[in-house]
């Protein structure tokens, strides 16, 4: 998917990018490739692949109608090189985006990236989701939490749901069907008062299958969750 294909496909979906937005995606690509030589950000560095498998894939929840251009508080867990939240922010500038990542070098990259792209209302924090999930400044504060290929739902639910307001939504982007994952996550979702409200499949323009699972938070998360860093992965609920 060339940049021109990317712009045209978005226009067909009703999103006509401004010259500023096009420049932001171009700068994003160039900085991603440049910084990838210093720290491991992605295995995908060819321009057409970045536009398809990072940029287009990241904004799929918007294209599929699951997010609006409103000043909602969005948290991205384990965003790595900023996916999916920063492409979403470029497309929908009204979003207020927070990223938590466990690697400080990635936070350095994201901070520089946001400055170069001229993004406002973006916040970056270094640390573990399990620790921030017990912090009152973060717990129960977000309308949406996004996670792209971070962990299976049994683990992901404990890392994300505590951050949501009641009625807030987890938007999980997956490359594989989530049916088996959701079956394994039933107990975790029950304990965390999360309910699957959508399990959506779609295709990238090249025909690759992708999946979006949306979980809504129904009640306050019990205070014992999330457990200490590492435990959700070692001993899933």
Curated annotation (Swiss-Prot):
Class of enzymatic activity (EC top level): transferase
SUPFAM superfamilies: S-adenosyl-L-methionine-dependent methyltransferases (SSF53335)
Binding site for S-adenosyl-L-methionine: 78, 83, 129-130, 148
CDD domains according to UniProt: AdoMet_MTases (cd02440)
Disulphide bridges, residue numbers: none
Subcellular location: Cytoplasm
Taxonomic superkingdom: Bacteria
Function: Specifically methylates the N7 position of a guanine in 16S rRNA.
Family annotation (HAMAP family): 16SrRNA_methyltr_G
Name recorded for this polypeptide: Ribosomal RNA small subunit methyltransferase G
Organism: Streptococcus pyogenes serotype M49 (strain NZ131)
């Amino acid at each position: 998917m060339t940049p021109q294909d990317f712009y045209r496909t978005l226009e067909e979906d009703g999103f006509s990018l401004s010259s500023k937005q096009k420049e932001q995606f171009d700068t994003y690509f160039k900085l991603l490739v440049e910084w990838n030589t210093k720290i491991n950000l992605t295995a995908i560095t060819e321009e057409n692949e970045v536009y398809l498998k990072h940029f287009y894939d990241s904004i799929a929840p918007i294209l599929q109608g699951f997010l609006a251009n409103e000043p909602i508080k969005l948290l991205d867990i384990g965003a790595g090189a900023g996916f999916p939240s920063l492409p979403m922010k470029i497309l929908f500038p009204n979003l207020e985006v927070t990223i938590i990542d466990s690697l400080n070098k990635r936070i350095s990259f994201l901070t520089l990236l946001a400055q170069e792209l001229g993004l406002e209302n973006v916040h970056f924090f270094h640390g573990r989701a399990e620790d921030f999930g017990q912090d009152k400044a973060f717990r129960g504060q977000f309308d949406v939490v996004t996670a792209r290929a971070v962990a299976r739902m049994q683990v992901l639910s404990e890392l994300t749901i505590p951050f949501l307001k009641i009625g807030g939504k987890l938007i999980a982007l997956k490359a594989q069907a989530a049916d088996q994952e959701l079956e394994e996550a039933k107990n975790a979702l029950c304990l965390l008062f999360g309910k699957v409200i959508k399990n959506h499949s779609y295709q990238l323009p090249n025909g690759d299958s992708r999946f979006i699972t949306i979980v809504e938070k129904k009640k306050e998360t019990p205070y014992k969750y999330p457990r200490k860093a590492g435990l959700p992965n070692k001993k899933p609920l």
